[in-house]
């Protein structure tokens, strides 16, 4: 698309450099988060959660995990939470079909949870930093966001009524059974605190989130080297950052990179900005515009769409375009949750797709309808409130 849109190679080079900077931040963030999660996993840290979840009832487990995901996303952000939940689900569910279905629901919950927090999604962070929204978005959007995940959960509760899940036998835990409890507790606690530190770091320093993530990873690296310094090299390697990095699949990162570059080419070609202008001219109604942006975000990614909307509309002192105005609040909801309609429509979806190898067509058949009814129900709730 870039080659078609620009005949001057200098412009192509400039645009590519611009997008690689933005995409690089997301990729480094993803690498840092995945490494921390893998480090916690290698120390059996997730057993602190999985051992407390005793139920094998599919419906009850779905509600428990969705609730955890919904609120974690508001604090950690939806991408990090989705990565954590993908690792957690593999510890809880043996059946491949059930694992993928639960993962699909977690994508919905992660995106719904991220939409009502200024730090829960990259688009809400953009709107927060840009001055379009403040912490007042929380009471305004939390109910529609909750409806967005509750409606699909009610629907699938009937489908999974009476069904149970089987726990997998984890070979990895057998190999690392000599990890003592205090090591597991330390790494789990520091891993969670490290992830929670990222939005705090962003708020205090105003530096990109990936720097906070890499700082947390660096701190964990030092800690693991200290607590495992007396162990033999083979055992120590599997419990430190170099070992965790070696277990991360490069295909996941490259897949993520390819998706973002494709979207960047559409943005550089002016296609996304043209679509935003057409929406404003043809529709006009702020609710319908945002609902349509939500649908588009499932295909074209929500970041450039929100960026385009921020460039099209100036902040006013009163009305729907004021700070915390209806347009910006509803944009945060629609852009955040609309991406759930397709697995490639959100960073959380793309990450889980890569980690668990979710098929694009499978997601459309099994999850997209649930995402649609939740998205529309939440939108209707916001409009009515």
Region locations from a protein language model:
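Alpha-helical transmembrane segments
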Residues: 22-32, 136-153, 204-218, 288-289, ...
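Hydrophobic core segments of alpha-helical transmembrane domains in multi-pass membrane transport
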Residues: 1-7, 31-38, 69-70, 110, ...
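Transmembrane helical segments that form the transport core of multi-pass membrane transport proteins
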Residues: 43, 65, 194, 198, ...
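Juxtamembrane and boundary regions of transmembrane helices in multi-pass small-molecule transporters
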Residues: 95-96, 100, 116-117, 126, ...
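Intrinsically disordered, low-complexity non-transmembrane regions of multi-pass membrane transporters
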Residues: 3, 10, 51, 55, ...
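Transmembrane helix-loop junctions at the membrane interface of multipass transporters and ion channels
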Residues: 124-134, 193-207, 383
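Membrane-interfacial helix-loop connectors
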Residues: 2-9, 20-21, 72-79, 83-109, ...
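Helical membrane-embedded segments and adjacent short helical loop/helix-boundary regions
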Residues: 1, 13-48, 54-61, 182-188, ...
């Amino acid at each position: 698309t870039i080659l078609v849109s620009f005949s001057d190679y200098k412009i192509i080079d400039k645009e590519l450099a611009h997008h690689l900077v933005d995409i690089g931040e997301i990729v480094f963030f993803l690498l840092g988060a995945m490494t921390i999660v893998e480090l916690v996993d290698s120390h059996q840290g997730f057993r602190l959660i999985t051992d407390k979840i005793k139920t094998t009832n599919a419906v009850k487990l779905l509600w428990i995990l969705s609730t955890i995901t919904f609120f974690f996303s508001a604090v950690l952000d939806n991408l990090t939470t989705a990565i954590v939940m993908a690792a957690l689900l593999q510890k809880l569910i043996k059946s491949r079909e059930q694992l993928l279905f639960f993962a699909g629901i977690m994508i919905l919950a992660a995106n719904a949870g991220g939409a009502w927090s200024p730090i829960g999604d990259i688009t809400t962070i953009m709107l927060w930093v840009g001055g379009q929204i403040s912490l007042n978005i929380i009471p305004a959007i939390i109910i529609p966001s909750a409806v967005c995940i509750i409606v699909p959960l009610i629907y699938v509760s009937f489908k999974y009524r009476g069904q149970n899940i089987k726990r997998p036998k984890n070979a990895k835990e057998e190999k690392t059974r000599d990890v003592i409890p205090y090591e597991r507790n330390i790494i789990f606690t520091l891993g969670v605190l490290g992830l929670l530190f990222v939005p705090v770091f962003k708020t205090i320093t105003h530096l990109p989130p990936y720097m906070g993530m890499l700082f947390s990873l660096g701190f964990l690296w030092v800690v693991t080297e200290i607590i495992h310094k007396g162990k033999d090299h083979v055992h120590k390697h599997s419990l430190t950052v170099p070992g965790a990095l070696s277990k991360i699949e490069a295909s996941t990162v490259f897949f993520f990179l390819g998706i973002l570059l494709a979207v960047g080419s559409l943005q550089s070609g002016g296609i996304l900005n043209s679509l935003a202008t057409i929406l404003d001219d043809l529709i006009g109604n702020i609710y319908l515009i945002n609902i349509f942006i939500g649908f588009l975000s499932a295909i074209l990614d929500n970041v450039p769409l929100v960026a385009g909307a921020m460039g099209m509309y100036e902040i006013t002192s009163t009305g729907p375009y004021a700070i915390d105005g209806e347009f910006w609040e509803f944009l945060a909801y629609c852009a955040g949750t609309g991406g759930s309609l397709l697995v490639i429509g959100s960073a959380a979806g793309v990450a889980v797709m890569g980690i668990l190898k979710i098929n694009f067509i499978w997601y459309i058949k099994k999850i997209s309808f649930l995402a649609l009814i939740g998205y529309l129900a939440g939108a209707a709730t916001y409009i009515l409130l």
